[in-house]
Amino acid sequence: MNPPADDMPARCHSYLQQFEAYMQSERQLSAHTVRNYLYELQRGRELLPEGIDLLNVGREHWQQVLAKLHRKGLSPRSLSLWLSAVKQWGEFLLRAGAIELNPAKGLSAPKQAKPLPKNIDVDSLTHLLEIDGNDPLTLRDKAIMELFYSSGLRLAELAALDLSSVQYDQREVRVLGKGNKERIVPVGRYAIDAISAWLECRRQIPCEDNALFVTEKGKRLSHRSIQARMSKWGQEQALSMRVHPHKLRHSFATHMLESSADLRAVQELLGHENLSTTQIYTSLDFQHLAKVYDNAHPRAKKQQDK
């Protein structure tokens, strides 16, 4: 639906109709997307200064509109949609020869804040890892979860492990990470014990290859199967949040930082290319420190009434 034309110059209205047709036919955008673009153009037009319309708008005008929308409380996602609409409008007018420069080119919305990953607290993780049973699947799943939490591996890294990947005497695991970069990661005693218990069962399974973690039929365990089994155990152990591999990786990183505060060491353990990727966990760690401060510092909270 086009913006109302009662107070819009006929030339501008004509270009809007052409823009709508161009989006639908040449760009082959969905009707929903086209409607959104037209709505966003109308939203921006209503905030333009008097005497400025969609054909003579300048970069400074769009900057002012962007600031107004931001002050109105629009989310970064909504601002990005608005910017996409006005940029497409400018590109269309350029192609049509109506303007010489796209006034929206180069404008950017505030970055969307990345949600902090949620970790599982130590007590809940301990409860999760206390699964009981001596059947092969339980022993295998326990070894998988112990290793995830012990070493902070990615799902793909753990699924790709072979029998030769774990060095039991040194308590280390050789991991092939992103970009085929190899790293050596320590493995805790509980994880080593759990893997050893699983291997006693694995030896009884005819296997197609040297995969460390296999199905009952001897095939390498898939990513999806690992995720499903972990989700199952989270439900059976009555955890308050859904359990998945990346959550154990987050928990590993957070708990390591809570204990050591050695950001670069955690970066190496996680296999992060850049330190900035690891720094997100400092936000989580600060949340923990803030709670400790509030509970422990004598002047962090009001004293009880005497």
From Swiss-Prot:
It is found in: Cytoplasm. SUPFAM superfamilies: DNA breaking-rejoining enzymes (SSF56349), lambda integrase-like, N-terminal domain (SSF47823). GO terms for cellular component: cytoplasm; Holliday junction resolvase complex. Residues 10-94 form the Core-binding (CB) domain. The keyword Cell division applies. The active site is at R154, K178, H246, R249, H272, Y281 (o-(3'-phospho-dna)-tyrosine intermediate). Pfam families: Phage_int_SAM_1 (PF02899), Phage_integrase (PF00589). Belongs to the 'phage' integrase family. XerC subfamily. This is Tyrosine recombinase XerC. The lineage of its organism: Bacteria, Pseudomonadati, Pseudomonadota, Gammaproteobacteria, Alteromonadales. The gene is xerC.
